[in-house]
Amino acid sequence: MNRLFGKAKPKAPPPSLTDCIGTVDSRAESIDKKISRLDAELVKYKDQIKKMREGPAKNMVKQKALRVLKQKRMYEQQRDNLAQQSFNMEQANYTIQSLKDTKTTVDAMKLGVKEMKKAYKQVKIDQIEDLQDQLEDMMEDANEIQEALSRSYGTPELDEDDLEAELDALGDELLADEDSSYLDEAASAPAIPEGVPTDTKNKDGVLVDEFGLPQIPAS
């Protein structure tokens, strides 16, 4: 049958609101151009009427101007109607798009809720509490280990009063050690002879030095 009558052509999709808006706007632009041409004719007729005297010729020009003005008013009405149609379709298109966006948002929210429920099923509060307890126990064990490592060995406990008494006594001992006995010893030491020592003799008539020892004669 397809060979005899041919295959039916697929139906074209119906025009969308965006396509209709484009078509209406194009028609409105075409009408605007016509109105502009009519405005130019009206200006020309108006100049002619100003320069002409009253009479049949002037009346004929006026009739032409009135016909052009009437066409202009009709085109303006058509343009206004098309503008209103375009506005209405744009509002409808905006509403449709808003509804589509709303549906997309709702679908995304539903999917999010579904994923959240799925995730919550995988998380159990008992496991979280057990994990917290394990962490707390591990922290306590770590603190005990630190205390054990920092513990001192063989250190007797000392009384604070005994330490203070020892400190006071230590101060007295330091003051006692800082005496001036070494100054007395220095004062009793033999004085350093001043000037050149003179020759002296002992009881046997032998020359002796300043220390009382016999002098060795120079060779």
From Swiss-Prot:
Pfam families: Snf7
GO cellular component, one term: multivesicular body
Keyword presence, Protein transport: yes
Keywords: Coiled coil, Cytoplasm, Endosome, Lipoprotein, Membrane, Phosphoprotein, Protein transport, Transport, Ubl conjugation
Residues with a covalently attached lipid ((Microbial infection) N6-stearoyl lysine): 7
UniProt xrefs under InterPro entries: Snf7_fam (IPR005024)
PTM (free text): (Microbial infection) Stearoylated By S.flexneri N-epsilon-fatty acyltransferase IcsB, promoting S.flexneri evasion of autophagy.
Residue segments, region Disordered: 1-21, 188-219
Subunit structure: Probable peripherally associated component of the endosomal sorting required for transport complex III (ESCRT-III). ESCRT-III components are thought to multimerize to form a flat lattice on the perimeter membrane of the endosome. Several assembly forms of ESCRT-III may exist that interact and act sequentially. Interacts with VTA1; the interaction involves soluble CHMP5. Interacts with CHMP2A. Interacts with NOD2. Interacts with BROX.
UniProt similarity note: Belongs to the SNF7 family.
UniProt protein name: Charged multivesicular body protein 5
Organism, as annotated: Homo sapiens
Origin organism lineage: Eukaryota, Metazoa, Chordata, Craniata, Vertebrata
